[in-house]
From Swiss-Prot:
Annotated protein name in UniProt: ATP synthase subunit a, chloroplastic
Keyword Electron transport applies: no
Organism: Coffea arabica
Function: Key component of the proton channel; it plays a direct role in the translocation of protons across the membrane.
High-level lineage: Eukaryota, Viridiplantae, Streptophyta, Embryophyta, Tracheophyta
PROSITE patterns attached to this UniProt entry: ATPASE_A (PS00449)
Amino acid sequence: MNVLANTLKGLYDVSGVEVGQHFYWQIGGFQVHGQVLITSWVVIAILLGSAAIAVRDPQTIPTGGQNFFEYVLEFIRDVSKTQIGEEYGPWVPFIGTLFLFIFVSNWSGALLPWKIIQLPHGELAAPTNDINTTVALALLTSVAYFYAGITKKGLSYFGKYIQPTPILLPINILEDFTKPLSLSFRLFGNILADELVVVVLVSLVPLVVPIPVMFLGLFTSGIQALIFATLAAAYIGESMEGHH
C-alpha cells in the first residue's frame, strides 16, 4: 500500500508541474524570454571562463586544461574538414561554437541544479530544452550555408534549384525549409524527452534508480551536439560544392 501511495503521490506531483509557463522580461514593446536568456548566459559564461582559465598561460608543450582544449579544437577541425573539404578553415569557429554551446547546454540540464532558482513563472532548464533556442541555432545554420554558397558561387548558386531538372524545383526549395526544421526539432525533442523521463523517474522511484538513465542522457546529449554540428558542416560543404 505504501508503494502504491508513493506512486500516486509522484504522479500527482508530476501532474502539478506547469507546462508552457514562461518568465518574460518586458523591454519596450517587446516580451523577452528571460528563462532562455538566463540559462544561455550561464552556458556562455562557463565556456568563456573555462577557456580563459585553461589558456591564460599557454605552454609550448600543452598540459592540463590547455591540452584538453587543443584536443577539442583538433576534433572540431577534423569534423569540419571531413564535411566541408579543404576550405574548412574559416568555418571552424562557427562549427566549434555550435558544438560547444549545444554540448554544454545539454549537459547543463542534467548537471546544474536549475530547480533551486525560483522564478515568478515557469522554471529554469537547459537552453536547448526550449524550442526558441533550437530554432535560432537552426536558422543560423541556414544563414551560414546560404552565405557559404553565395560567397563561393555568386548568384549561380541558386541554379542548384533546377538541377538535375527544373521539374524538381519545388522539391529543392522545400528541402531548404526542411533542413532547419529537422535540425531544430530533433535537438529539442531529444533533450526535452530526456529531461521529462528523468523528472518522472525521480518523482516515482528512489534517487538511485534514475541514475543510469541520467548517465544515458549525458551520452545522448553529447551525441546530439555532435549530430547537429556535423549536419551543419555537411550543409555548408554541400552548398559550396553543389552536390547532394
